[in-house]
């Protein structure tokens, strides 16, 4: 008899941070990830990334859940709250990730002073070289950006200091080589996590866990296979891959980074830019608008559930491929 192999069910997720209500940018991410994973008969998980207790608010969490339900974006399984999983993250930090971590007492002020000195030295050296070669230097004496020190790379002052892990921040060493992956929307990607993020802070002195570390562990523990999220998170991806590998967790098999939603002025919609919260009083109209913004075929104006079923049946990533942004001006007046 032929041997049949059962492939694991695809699992996607939406993981908002409750530092504000959902806006059109976060809605399109939720909608795209929901329709895509459901179109391949997968599960859609909801995880609230609320490790930042200073900025996250329970009332925003509650509103996010209300808005998703009003739009028919119903999640599978129980909602995961990262604020309730701190012990899990610390267990990984103190066990399988321990060889990669070290305590650090460097303040931002100290590092800022160090980088400023390095940049001044680089500018002086560059000017001297230019003079020696009889090359004219611009009056403003600006230095090519590729010659400046990389401020993302922590200079590892504390890597051998053997400081207390409970009284200082904790850094994790990221690999200094290129990691590649195929992005289903943006194409083949290569990045060096050490060059991009350096030895990132995994846990602050007050115990707060870095969201990249928490997301990496949770994605592995939840056995997520497909991640569809905003393009602004793309630079974090190789760090996440390396952390999951170091933690001996299954890595993500399918990545998709969506183009960013921009207002008519070309500015990315975000909480920092005071993007307006979505209004779910007319959920069907809002879904139709978001689907059109995502380049999907029109759906019949109906209940959210029926509209989503139609959107799922005809979901297509092709209109999004290679796109860096989607501007609301293209369909302004139809919201």
From Swiss-Prot:
Its EC number is 6.1.1.-. It is an enzyme of class 6 (ligase). A motif ('HIGH' region) lies at residues 16-26. The keyword Transmembrane does not apply. Binds 1 zinc ion per subunit. GO terms for biological process: glutamyl-tRNA aminoacylation. L-glutamate binds at residues 13-17, 49, 211, 229. Pfam families: tRNA-synt_1c. ATP binds at residue 271. Belongs to the class-I aminoacyl-tRNA synthetase family. GluQ subfamily. This is Glutamyl-Q tRNA(Asp) synthetase. It comes from Psychrobacter arcticus (strain DSM 17307 / VKM B-2377 / 273-4). The lineage of its organism: Bacteria, Pseudomonadati, Pseudomonadota, Gammaproteobacteria, Moraxellales.
């Amino acid at each position: 008899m032929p041997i049949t192999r059962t492939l694991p069910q695809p699992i996607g997720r939406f993981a908002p941070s409750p530092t504000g209500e959902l806006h059109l940018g976060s809605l399109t991410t939720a909608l795209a990830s929901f329709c895509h994973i459901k179109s391949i008969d997968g599960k859609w998980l909801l995880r609230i990334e609320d490790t930042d207790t200073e900025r996250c608010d329970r009332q925003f969490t509650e509103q996010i859940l209300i808005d998703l339900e009003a739009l028919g974006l119903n999640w599978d399984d129980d909602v995961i709250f990262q604020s309730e999983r701190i012990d899990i993250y610390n267990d990984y930090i103190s066990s399988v990730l321990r060889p990669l971590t070290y305590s650090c007492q460097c303040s931002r002020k100290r590092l800022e002073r160090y980088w400023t000195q390095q940049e001044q030295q680089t500018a002086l050296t560059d000017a001297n070289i230019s003079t020696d070669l009889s090359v004219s230097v611009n009056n403003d004496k600006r230095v090519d950006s590729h010659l400046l020190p990389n401020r993302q790379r922590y200079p590892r002052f504390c890597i051998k200091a053997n400081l207390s892990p409970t009284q200082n921040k904790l850094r994790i060493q990221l690999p200094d080589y290129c990691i590649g992956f195929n992005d289903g929307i943006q194409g083949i990607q290569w990045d060096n996590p050490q060059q991009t993020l350096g030895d990132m802070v995994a846990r602050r002195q007050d115990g707060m866990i870095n969201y990249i570390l928490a997301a990496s562990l949770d994605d592995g523990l939840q056995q997520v296979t497909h991640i569809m999220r905003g393009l602004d998170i793309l630079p974090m991806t190789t760090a996440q891959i390396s952390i999951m590998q170091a933690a001996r967790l299954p890595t993500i098999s399918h990545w998709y980074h969506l183009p960013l939603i921009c207002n008519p002025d070309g500015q990315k919609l975000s909480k920092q830019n005071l993007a307006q919260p979505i209004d779910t009083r007319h959920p069907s109209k809002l879904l139709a608008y978001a689907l059109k913004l995502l380049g999907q075929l029109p759906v019949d104006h109906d209940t959210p559930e029926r509209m989503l079923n139609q959107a799922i049946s005809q979901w297509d990533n092709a209109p999004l491929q290679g796109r860096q942004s989607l501007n609301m001006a293209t369909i302004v007046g139809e919201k």
